[in-house]
Swiss-Prot record:
GO terms for molecular function: phosphate:acyl-[acyl carrier protein] acyltransferase activity. The lineage of its organism: Bacteria, Pseudomonadati, Thermodesulfobacteriota, Desulfuromonadia, Geobacterales. It comes from Geotalea uraniireducens (strain Rf4) (Geobacter uraniireducens). This is Phosphate acyltransferase. One of its GO terms (biological process) is fatty acid biosynthetic process. One of its GO terms (cellular component) is cytoplasm. Belongs to the PlsX family. It catalyses: a fatty acyl-[ACP] + phosphate = an acyl phosphate + holo-[ACP].
Amino acid sequence: MRVAVDAMGGDNAPVVEVEGAVAAAGEFGIPVTLVGDTDRVNQELAKYNCKGLDITVKHASEVVGMHDSASDAVRKKKDSSIRVAFDLVKNDEAVAVVSAGNSGATMAAGMFVLKRLKGIDRPAIAQIFPTLRGKTLVLDVGGNVDCKPLHLVQFAIMGEVYARFVMGVDNPRIGLLSNGEEESKGNDLTRETSALLKNTSLDYFGYVEGRDIFNGIVDVVVCDGFVGNVVLKLSEGLAEAVGKMLKDEIKQSLLSKIGYLLSRKAFVNFKKKVDYSEYGGAPLLGIDGVGMICHGGSNAKAIKNAIRFAHEYAQKGVNQRMAEKLQENYPLYMQQLEMLKVQAAG
């Protein structure tokens, strides 16, 4: 099962993409196709001993930049590295795409080339967060800034399946992000979504607050892409700031430095737990295929792990399970949605 990597996406392309691909092929035995400028990609590959590694290169003459519109990836730049990568999946030459490029363009290309899963109106970008009890999946973290209750219910179903079959959670609990735990809190979007979620087969916990993401009281947290992206960027900034503050404090005295040396293993383990590169990338859920969106500043380790997770996602047939779960729940939440419409009209 081959993974296609957008070798020209991201701040450090194609350097980190090539290094990450070589590492994934070497450590995990995953076949990889690097998509991009053949000359530049081969120049980077020449730095490594790739003997015995299943790595191929597919030429793409165009690149979608970070400031290009999402539509450019689909309509204007048909030979862009991200578009060609998804074409490989469509033509059964790969099972997944990994890209650290323009996330909007990646999402648009995935939807245009591979289409959406049956029962999905809008795909969502999901992100794993480290918690006090393990891990929590949050979605949407940036794919859709304006959502309807129906979209959030679909996000919850996709998140439940991903948590169960990729994260290994036996019975995932679903929480809806709000400004308080009480049912009286929230806005029209969360209140209507909550009513729909209660009418599904999911283990719906109810409202959760922002702090609960890191407490780990639920396994999946659902929100619209506007709120989710704020949560994501806030957590990234906080982790970076805390790390710098800690370093500054350690430098203040000899005693602090000695304390750090004695506790170094704990610090290393903590850093590993909050390091985004450990999780690779954010899965694009809801397209009829596998797409992994990486941070624009991803290092080789992040690319390597994104390839691993994308390969695992495809291996486990998660999309088929999502389609089945969506079909199972469709009549349940649609019945409730019709009731809410009648109440609103009356």
